[in-house]
Amino acid sequence: MRLKDLGERALLRKLAPLGYPQEAPLPPGDDAGGVWADGVAWLLKTDGFLYREVALKGMGPFEVGFRGVAATASDLLVKMGRPLGFTLGLFLPEDLEEGFVLELVRGAAEAAKRLGAFLRGGDTNRGVEVALTVSGYALAEAPLPRKALPGDLLYLAGDR
């Protein structure tokens, strides 16, 4: 079956039994994963972005870098995680201007700073177009799975 016909939820249900441990802090299909260590959950979230798909009108590389970290952090925050750091995986055409890359990373660093966290590393790769992968890690004493229930408070984090 083609992914466009299957859908994300059905795909996640099929992926869940492929090596996902039962004792994980969050259930299969959640937006983040993690491990328990000394009674605290260390959460990890990874998001991938194609620049051309996330750069809204009027956004430059600074805003896209900021948005990448903010989106990744949002998924950790709703799990009751406290973000500690982020890494960036950058895919960059070799003819891209240096200033573009610096602004992209400055935006990501600013978003991390506003969360009391830092950029902690990453990777650069040659790519046919600009893309970024943002991974964030956080601590959570009692992580919340994605299942919202009637009466739960909902918080919106975003720019649109």
Predicted regions and their residues:
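Extreme N-terminal cap/leader segments of soluble proteins
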Residues: 1-60, 88, 106-111, 120, ...
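Glycine-rich anion-binding loops of enzyme active sites
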Residues: 39-42, 49, 84-160
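Basic side chains
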Residues: 45, 67, 79, 145-146
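Short N-terminal helix-initiation segments at or just after the protein's N-terminus
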Residues: 26-33, 78-79, 97-101
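Small-aliphatic-rich amphipathic alpha-helix that forms the alpha element of a beta-alpha
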Residues: 61-85, 106-114
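Residues at secondary-structure transition points
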Residues: 29, 59-63, 67, 99
